[in-house]
């Protein structure tokens, strides 16, 4: 069973399973706690309006600490496992894992926005062009998805190159390895340059 208190003893494994160093994790945690506490003050974990009883964590909870909750959702985002597999790693039934995923995903996204680490998704939101000229890395990231049920979507998302159904995003990363722009999600077979042209983002003049 994966737990923060155990994983923190191995910083390299911690980075591999979350995409964050321990220091980066702790920095994000402070914003995550604020978002989580604000949510459970109003709603139950099932998303229903909270009445009289305040939120408390049970001793036998599968995610007993705020660190474990953040670890749970970051590990899910980093490794993209099946919910059944993710549930097994954290010692809970799949239905409970699904509930936690749907609860924590928007909270961690909001936390990243709060600390200024959420990449721009639209050209008009990007501040790339305002930066000083520098080194930027541009790449397309293609990943598999489950076979769509709709025949038209099957045709759209099937990649002959990969021999599977895929989606793609373009990312722009600066020299310190911070993701500065993340394009919309499209079919994996779309050409990287075409997606870049459609996204319309611009790096500072004189950049490499």
Residue ranges and their predicted role:
Residues 17, 61-62, 75, 90-93:
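Short secondary-structure transition/capping motifs
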Residues 80-208:
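Short, well-ordered secondary-structure "scaffold" segments embedded in the functional core
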Residues 65-79:
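Short, amphipathic alpha-helical "recognition" segments used to contact nucleic acids or chromatin
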Residues 1-61:
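Charged, often Cys/His-bearing segments associated with DNA-binding zinc-finger transcription factors
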Residues 59-67, 159:
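Structural motif
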């Amino acid at each position: 069973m994966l737990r923060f208190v155990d994983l923190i003893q191995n910083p390299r494994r911690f980075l591999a399973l979350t995409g964050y160093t321990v220091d980066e994790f702790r920095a994000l945690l402070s914003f995550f706690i604020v978002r989580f506490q604000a949510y459970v003050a109003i709603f139950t974990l099932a998303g229903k309006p909270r009445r009289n009883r305040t939120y408390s964590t049970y001793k036998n909870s599968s995610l007993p600490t705020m660190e474990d909750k953040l670890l749970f959702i970051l590990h899910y985002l980093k490794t993209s496992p099946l919910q059944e597999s993710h549930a097994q790693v954290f010692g809970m039934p799949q239905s409970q894992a699904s509930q936690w995923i749907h609860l924590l995903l928007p909270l961690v996204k909001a936390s990243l926005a709060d600390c200024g680490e959420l990449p721009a998704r639209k050209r008009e939101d990007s501040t790339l062009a305002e930066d000083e000229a520098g080194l930027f890395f541009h790449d397309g990231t293609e990943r598999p998805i489950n076979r769509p049920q709709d025949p038209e979507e099957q045709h759209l998302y099937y990649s002959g190159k990969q021999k599977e159904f895929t989606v793609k995003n373009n990312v722009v990363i600066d020299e310190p390895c911070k993701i500065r722009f993340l394009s919309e999600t499209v079919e994996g077979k779309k050409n990287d340059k075409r997606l870049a042209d459609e996204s319309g983002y611009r790096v500072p003049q004189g950049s490499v």
